[in-house]
From Swiss-Prot:
PROSITE patterns: PEPCASE_1, PEPCASE_2. Pfam families: PEPcase (PF00311). This is Phosphoenolpyruvate carboxylase 2. PANTHER family: PHOSPHOENOLPYRUVATE CARBOXYLASE (PTHR30523), PHOSPHOENOLPYRUVATE CARBOXYLASE 3 (PTHR30523:SF33). Keywords: Allosteric enzyme, Carbon dioxide fixation, Cytoplasm, Lyase, Magnesium, Photosynthesis. GO terms for molecular function: phosphoenolpyruvate carboxylase activity. Pathway: Photosynthesis; C3 acid pathway. It is an enzyme of class 4 (lyase). One of its GO terms (biological process) is leaf development. Its main location: cytoplasm. Its EC number is 4.1.1.31.
Length: 960
């Protein structure tokens, strides 16, 4: 039997370019893994894995459904323990393939940097947002002056908002092992490596591959919001904390190269971080006020700890004695007031001599940081602390003041190069992360605020707020906001829900205001939604009220958003309150689920244009907050392209974007990834402001308006109006079983009963991604384009022109093309054959015909013969992955069949995988099956199913 290694080389015969080592990396990791598999579980299982791979590769070659049946008969003959080992093996091999890709991409980038040569890369020149290249392009091609660039850069802000959306399907224990495999692989191919080093690295590589394979991939309990927050914060520890100053230094260098001899000021807010973990209550009952308080204190403790761990390095560096009189006086004062040794410090524990004034001052900063950390720790553990608040840092200004004093003094004494060393990095960290590491956003559904208001008005006996008209609500809210009297006392009758809203606001009042960012209202529709939150914040005595951000998601809400925001701006009280700044959030996932991708993308585009117009009329600076998912169905896609395809004037130097679940790992999992992410966001935001994309021509708009209606009708006629669609969806995908994956702390439905409306956008997309049919992404496109071309043949050339000249349209089409390249209707047909009742088969066939028709139209408009012909690298990477995914799909479909149909009989062959310990060889299957004793299905089926879900998610790389 040909080894997988040989098969790989057959599958991808030609290198894409000289520096293409992907197949080599992939083959090395697989060889190592298969040897480990054989050592642990015996030769038979290795052969079974190879046989499955071979059948899949044959299927991928000709797409002959018979090959899938052959594959199915191999897979269904495995007993419980064996099918777990096979599922785990394929899932593991896909993870290894992803790692090989990441190392290859990093390698090609490095080569490209060394050659500084041409960019015939998957991210052709338009997408490569290297900050230096962007500066040079702006100066050379667009005639901007270096000063203009510096000025725009200093005043722009990108705020990355980490959300714990339940799409990160890999456990943290595994992510760390993956990181080490990546490092070993990269070092193994370094040029100057000695034979001994090579041998040791190879051993380390095998060790990590085995450790990852021997780790249970399945989360046995759902994570709590605190777990999610700790997982999110671990990226700060590992990459972001050090990555930010490193990135800002690169910006300084790039500025120098275009002739600016200044550094980016440390108080320029280039990059900010926020978080929803522990603040996002929308549909997640597990996020309680208690959780919000814990998460804030934990983040403060982590921030103080990170600063504390660096302050001694700074004390070592600043050993100078020349300083300004002001600093000398401060140092003397501190020196005389503290006369004790500090034995709990490792360095500088003795009394610091007065002739080292910077160290004296930093010593005091260190004491305060120590107290700040300990106070947060005690508050977290016991709810109280014996450290007085005035011995800690409570505001950013307090913390910055002594550091700025040192910086100014060094510069005044001619030691600017020293000031611009570690001290500048430290100042930039302080300015970026503050005392709270990230600012926590609070998100709540608008109905919950309405319930609270209703309880208040009923209690005051002035009627039912719920039944009032919008006008009456506004009038009452404004009269209360202009007045001074408290609205309610402790005698307000409260349900659990109402108490939850009010207790959350009390937490906001109790904790320092720099812990928090925005208060986001989901499903917002009218000005009263915003005013109600303003009033509640005042009633709960939030000293510095959070800015209130309406979130518009559904198609109808997006269309009505500009008018709602205009009404809000026309209220004098509100206009005075916001001080000329407003943030509006637009949701990509729910709009896509509601109307389909094409109409949602166009509605989001138009809503932004109109919102910016409204803000201009009222003299308000608008920040758009983009709630994008990681998948295309939920608005995902390459960062820089997404930003550069936004309508002109909508970015305007300030941008907020959610970074979710698995996207956090792809963007910040490694130092070089973190660096690249920060570059991309900064460069694309700058470029969008200084060189905005073109506005679409009136005839393009008219055409899109017309066909978007057709797309929505087609999408809704199937998803919402087809009477048996929900039944078909639940049968043809693993949607019902998705909840068992324990990915996130949030339930997968808004309301337990009900159809597609109540299903969250994430499981909706996840389920279709599993069967490689991706219905939500493409449904509607074919009908829309077909209608346009049928109506007038000339429309084809109009659409082609739109594709070639208009970034927004091009990005929309390219992303759908990429999803088609990952899709496979033959696999979806297998699920139908096994799982769907026969009278629904014609419906599935109709959808698959739609898939093919839409694919053809997309290729026509893009002017491509084959999918992804403009992107050979991505095409090669997808081809390498397909054969692994196919085995997992077949295994998933047959496992679902066994779970759902008790009468489905399969002929099992004898158990083949051996366990290493011979003493247990009489009950080896039992070992693996025992991991999940509470499963309601036959032994091993649930674990096999979850492993296939995780494997396919790893292969598709855009889970939810």
């Amino acid at each position: 039997m040909a080894s997988i290694d040989a098969q790989l080389r057959l599958l991808v015969p030609a290198k894409v370019s000289e520096d293409d080592k992907l197949v080599e990396y992939d083959a090395l990791l697989l060889d190592r893994f298969l040897d480990i598999l054989q050592d642990l579980h015996g030769e038979d299982i290795r052969e079974t894995v190879q046989e499955c791979y071979e059948r899949s590769a044959e299927y991928e070659g000709k797409h002959d459904p018979k090959k899938l049946d052959e594959l199915g008969s191999v897979l269904t003959s495995l007993d419980a323990g064996d099918s777990i080992v096979v599922a785990k093996s394929f899932s593991h091999m896909l993870n290894l393939a992803n790692l090989a890709e990441e190392v290859q991409i990093a390698y090609r980038r490095r080569i490209k940097k060394l050659k500084k040569g041409d960019l015939s890369d998957e991210n052709s020149a338009t997408t490569e947002s290297d900050i230096e290249e962007t500066f040079k392009r702006l100066v050379a091609e667009l005639g901007k002056s270096p000063e203009e660039i510096f000025d725009a850069l200093k005043n722009q802000t990108v705020d990355l908002v980490f959300t714990a959306h339940p799409t990160q399907s890999v456990r943290r224990s595994l992510l760390q092992k993956h990181g080490r495999i990546r490092n070993c692989l990269a070092q193994l191919y370094a040029k100057d490596i000695t034979p001994d080093d090579k041998q040791e690295l190879d051993e380390a590589l095998q060790r990590e591959i085995q450790a990852a394979f021997r780790t249970d991939e399945i989360r046995r309990t759902p994570p709590t919001p605190q777990d999610e927050m700790r997982a999110g914060m671990s990226y700060f520890h590992e990459t972001i904390w050090k990555g930010v100053p490193k990135f800002l230094r690169r910006v300084d260098t790039a500025l120098k190269n275009i002739g600016i001899n200044e550094r980016v000021p440390y108080n320029a807010p280039l990059i900010q971080f926020s978080s929803w973990m522990g603040g996002d209550r929308d549909g997640n009952p597990r996020v309680t006020p208690e959780v919000t308080r814990d998460v804030c204190l934990l983040a403060r403790m982590m921030a103080a700890n990170l600063y504390f761990s660096q302050i001694e390095d700074l004390m070592f560096e600043l050993s100078m004695w020349r300083c300004t009189d002001e600093l000398r006086a401060r140092a003397d004062e501190l020196h005389s007031s503290s006369r004790r040794d500090a034995k709990h410090y490792i360095e500088f524990w003795k009394h610091i001599p007065p002739n080292e004034p910077y160290r004296v001052i930093l010593g005091d900063v260190r004491d305060k940081l120590y107290n700040t950390r300990e106070r947060s720790r005690q508050m977290l553990s016991h709810g109280v602390s014996d450290i007085p608040e005035d011995a800690t840092y409570t505001s950013l200004e307090q913390f910055l003041e002594p550091l700025e004093l040192c910086y100014g003094s060094l510069c005044a004494c001619g030691d600017r190069p020293i000031a611009d060393g570690t001290l500048l990095d430290f100042l930039r960290q302080v300015f970026t992360f503050g005392l709270s590491l990230v600012r926590l956003d609070i998100r709540q559904e608008s109905d919950r605020h309405t319930d609270v208001m209703d309880a208040i008005t009923q209690h005051l006996e002035i009627g039912s707020y719920k039944e009032w008209s919008e006008e009456k609500r506004q009038e009452w809210l404004l009269s209360e906001l202009s007045g001074k009297r408290p609205l309610f006392g402790s005698d307000l009758p409260q349900t659990e829900e109402i108490a939850d809203v009010l207790d959350t606001l009390h937490v906001l009042a109790e904790l320092p205001s720099d812990c928090f960012g925005a208060y986001i209202i989901s499903m917002a529709t009218s000005p009263s939604d915003v005013l109600a939150v303003e009033l509640l914040q005042r009633e709960c005595r939030v000293k510095q009220p959070l800015r209130v951000v309406p979130l518009f998601e559904k198609l109808a809400d997006l269309e009505a958003a500009p008018a709602a925001v205009a009404r809000l701006f026309s209220i004098d009280w509100y206009k005075n309150r916001i001080n000329g700044k407003q943030e509006v959030m637009i949701g990509y996932s729910d709009s896509g689920k509601d109307a389909g991708r094409l109409s949602a993308a166009w509605a989001l585009y138009k809503a932004q244009e109109e919102l910016v117009q409204v803000a201009k009329e009222y003299g308000v600076k608008l920040t758009m907050f983009h709630g994008r998912g990681g998948t295309v169905g939920r608005g995902g896609g390459p960062t820089h392209l997404a930003i550069l395809s936004q309508p002109p004037e909508t970015v305007n130097g300030s941008l907020r974007v959610t970074v979710q679940g698995e996207v956090i790992e792809q963007s910040f999992g490694e130092e070089h990834l973190c660096f690249r992410t920060l570059q991309r966001f900064t460069a694309a935001t700058l470029e969008h402001g200084m060189h905005p994309p073109i506005s679409p021509k009136p005839e393009w708009r008219a055409l899109l308006d017309e066909i978007a209606v057709v797309a929505t009708e087609k999408y809704r006629s199937i998803v919402f109006k087809e009477p048996r669609f929900v039944e078909y969806f639940r049968l043809a995908t693993p949607e019902l079983e998705y909840g068992r994956m324990n990915i996130g702390s949030r339930p997968s439905k808004r309301k337990p009963s009900g159809g597609i409306e109540s299903l969250r956008a994430i499981p909706w997309i996840f389920a279709w991604t599993q069967t490689r049919f991706h219905l939500p992404v493409w449904l509607g496109f074919g009908a829309a384009f077909g209608y346009a071309i049928q109506k007038d043949v000339k429309n084809l050339s109009v659409l082609q022109k739109m594709y070639n000249e208009w970034p927004f349209f091009r990005v929309t089409i390219d992303l759908v093309e990429m999803v088609f390249a990952k899709g496979d209707p033959g696999i979806a047909a297998l699920y139908d054959k096994l799982l769907v009742s026969e009278e629904l088969w014609p419906f599935g066939e109709r959808l698959r015909a739609d898939f093919e028709e839409t694919k053809g139209l997309i290729l026509k408009i893009a002017g491509h013969k084959d999918l992804l012909e403009g992107d050979p690298y991505l095409r090669q990477r997808l081809r390498l992955r397909d054969s692994y995914i196919t085995t997992l799909n077949a295994l998933q479909a047959y496992t679902l069949k066994r779970i759902r149909d008790p009468n489905y009989n399969v002929q099992l062959r004898p158990h083949i995988s051996k366990e290493y310990m011979d003493s247990t060889s009489n009950k080896p299957a039992a070992e693996l099956v025992k991991l999940n004793p509470s499963s309601e299905y036959a032994p091993g089926l649930e674990d096999t199913l979850i492993l296939t879900m995780k494997g396919i998610a790893a292969g598709m790389q855009n889970t939810g």
